[in-house]
Amino acid sequence: LRPTAPVADNTVIRYERSGGIAGRTSSWTIYASGRVVDGAGVETKADQAKLAALVTIARDPKTLALTSPAGRGCPDCFKYTVSIQTPGANVSLVTYDGVTNPPELDALLLALAEVTR
């Protein structure tokens, strides 16, 4: 038997938070390798434990089956846009402060906040 190279994890997560009192937009692209690039192009390395938790949630079939919850923005609220690209699926989700999200989406948003702090 010939050893095979490990399969690269090509999971990419794009996360944008916009609105709030100041009306600001912040965005990040997070790679499973740990590379995090913010909207200004500044690159950092994610904490490995926080990244592992995020990637596990993002690749969960329940997360990949989500659709955006019904809801709309409100004054001074944040809008959250998340796109997940995996080798087998592409998902885009939008939600807002004050919307009742499925538990999988809440877990994803919490993990994203941890990685992008």
Q: What residue ranges belong to the model's regions?
A:
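Short, well-ordered, aromatic-rich surface patches in folded extracellular/luminal domains
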Residues: 1-20, 42-45, 49-52, 56-57, ...
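Short, solvent-exposed loop/hinge segments that bridge or flank secondary-structure elements
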Residues: 19-31
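Acidic/histidine-rich, surface-exposed loop or edge segments in extracytoplasmic proteins
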Residues: 28-42, 89-91
